Amino acid sequence: NTDEIDTSQFDIETLDMIIPMDSSLLAGREDDGETTILCLGNNPFSDDRGSTGLAAQIASKTNSTVYDCGFPDSSAACKYPIYNPEYTKDHFNLFYVVECFRNNEFTAISSIANDEADPRYAETVEVMKTVDMNKVDIIIIMYDSTDYNMGTPSDNPDNPNDVTAFTGGLRTTIENIKSTWPYIRIFVMSPTYARYMDENGDLHNGTTTDMGNGTLNHYLVKESDVAMDCGVSFIDNYFGTI
């Protein structure tokens, strides 16, 4: 029972950062009286698309229309800096998903999704096709520890927009969203605490295990830095959930 937990015993400060929407960015935009939220990410959204899933809970709590466009096991970073047709799964990663919306073009991602054995890929693309970006008020971006687990570089100090790095994929995509739809408010939600499973099936603490590019909470701090740099809100689920 969380009601019985004395939070004062935890010496942890969350990295939450809520940034108000600049009203000037809404100039000329007609309020349709309905809040529409687009969810982008991976397993936190794609694992449960039913009434108990994260997107459904957001819809219930906010009385909003919510589109769940999360792809299973996708990542914030891309595998290749430019699209490689030999690795079609890059289409499901954040940068390319947003490019589909920006270009209003879903032919390639639909074809690739239909080749996947997991039906959730094709189901997500069908949801994407129904989204009217002119009506979207909020975009929520949430990825779990996949980028960390895969050993994706947390960042590229020489190129902050390197889409093959965790922060570069986020930064580039957020900048693209803001330039295309300046009226959309963006929330970046961090992964929760997680443990890494090695090839032997042994679990390792994400807070202390460095996969070669930092511990999981190193990725968390880097992610919050990107949100701050881009001027968007950040929700810390790592230290903010028990």
What are these regions (language model features)?
Residues D32-G33:
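Acidic, glycine-anchored loop motifs typical of Ca2+
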Residues D22-R29:
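A short, basic/flexible loop-to-alpha-helix module at the beginning of a structural domain
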Residues T36, T65, Y183-R185:
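Residues at the starts of beta-strands that form the adenosine-phosphate
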Residues E4-D22:
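Non-catalytic propeptide/linker segments at domain boundaries
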Residues S110-I242:
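Alpha-helical cap/lid subdomain in secreted, periplasmic
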Residues L38-C39, P44-N161:
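Conserved SGNH/GDSL esterase-like catalytic core that processes O-acyl groups on lipids
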